[in-house]
Curated annotation (Swiss-Prot):
This is NLP effector protein 6. Secreted effector that contributes strongly to virulence during infection by P.capsici. Causes large necrotic areas in both host C.annuum and non-host N.benthamiana. It is found in: Secreted. It comes from Phytophthora capsici. Keywords: Glycoprotein, Secreted, Signal, Virulence. InterPro entries: NPP1. GO terms for cellular component: extracellular region. Induction: Expression reached the highest levels at 3 days after inoculation of pepper leaves, followed by a gradual decline. Residues 1-19 form the signal peptide. The gene is NLP6. Glycans are attached at N81.
Length: 338
């Protein structure tokens, strides 16, 4: 039997009982002769004045709902005992607030790079310096540096040598004794051309530099070490087909400037230069129509930190490094051909 059915039956019984209690109660009063007189006494009426008749209290009829039990039904299924796996963790009830996620530990600030102090020169034999292999160009300036790399022809004097290696060790050069080309006919490790580039007045300038162990047109003449360089001025390295606008080549303390570069000194995108001397003057460069040799190129930003520090600090005597931080822009300004 459902709970609702029991509830309504109980209400009906209770209403019936109250109705009977509210009706006229019949009471029997014994007369003085022993006969019985049946009187109707209305509940709630004035009591009899002749004889005090005690009205019996109505019998209270009720149902104790505490003894009722509910039968399971489809709408209220019976409780079932559910067995949980032994590794199940029950959350406390009421549920506790989850602790906040801890903030990640901030990365420690790296210690500042200590000052390496002044550069200490590291000289090695001129024929012991290993060149940098030409790296694959990545940036626009690096690609332009390879595209416009010049070629050099050696008429007299030394072949170009690498000046510095990855550790910052620099070639010690040669004395001016002996023949102009004595002991400097070429490095067994290969040679090097150094590049550096920049914008100047809306034109892209690329400087290419070569190092020679000595500059000696004749025995006992000249000096240890020599640097020579050429500068190619192009319109814009970012366009698909950049063009050479002008060129300048180092000549003693100045430049030979060509605006525009003669077509006969350009091989595709390569400027042709010659290393020569006019006795008794020292060696210098000039543009030429003759082809020359290429060397592995390395741009300034592709050098190691030690190599750049060495080139910024080492004194090559009467020869100065044209593309280091102190000389590069002044040289570009002096070579301006427009």
């Amino acid at each position: 039997m459902r709970f609702t059915t029991i509830f309504w039956i109980s209400l009906t019984v209770l209403a019936t009982v109250r109705a009977e209690d509210g009706s006229h109660a019949q009471n029997e009063v014994q007369a003085g002769d022993g006969s019985h007189v049946q009187n109707e006494v209305q509940v709630g009426s004035e009591p009899q004045t002749q004889d005090s008749i005690e009205t019996p209290k109505p019998t209270i009829k009720y149902i104790d709902f505490g003894d009722l039990t509910l039968s399971p039904s489809a709408s209220s299924p019976a409780k079932r005992n559910v067995t949980l796996p032994p590794d199940t963790t029950m959350r406390p009830d009421p549920r506790q607030t989850e602790p906040p996620t801890e903030a990640p530990t901030p990365a420690s600030t790296p210690a500042p790079t200590p000052d390496p102090g002044p550069w200490v020169d590291k000289w090695i034999g001129h024929d012991q310096v290993k060149p940098f292999p030409q790296p694959e160009p990545v940036t626009i300036s690096e690609k332009a540096g390879v595209k416009f790399k010049p070629q050099i022809q050696i008429r007299t004097g030394c072949e170009p040598y690498p000046a510095v290696n990855e550790y910052g060790e620099t070639g010690g050069g040669l004395k001016t004794t002996g023949k102009s080309r004595g002991n400097c006919g070429g490095s067994g490790y290969g040679s090097q051309v150094y590049g550096r580039s920049t914008w100047i007045r809306g034109v892209w300038a690329i400087m290419y530099s070569w190092y020679f162990p000595k500059d000696s047109p004749s025995p006992k003449m000249g000096h240890r070490h020599d640097w020579e360089h050429a500068i190619v001025f192009i319109d814009n390295p970012e366009v698909s087909e950049p063009k050479i606008l002008a060129c300048s080549v180092s000549s003693h303390d100045g430049y030979k400037k060509y605006n525009p570069c003669p077509s006969w000194v350009i091989d595709g995108t390569s400027l042709k230069v010659r290393y020569k001397h006019a006795w008794p003057l020292n060696h210098d460069l000039d543009a030429t129509g003759d082809g020359g040799k290429f060397q592995d190129s390395i741009m300034w930003n592709q050098l190691t930190e030690d190599a750049r520090r060495a080139l910024n600090s080492v004194s090559f005597g009467k020869a100065n490094t044209p593309f280091n931080d102190g000389k590069f822009m002044p040289k570009i300004e002096n070579a301006w051909p427009f």
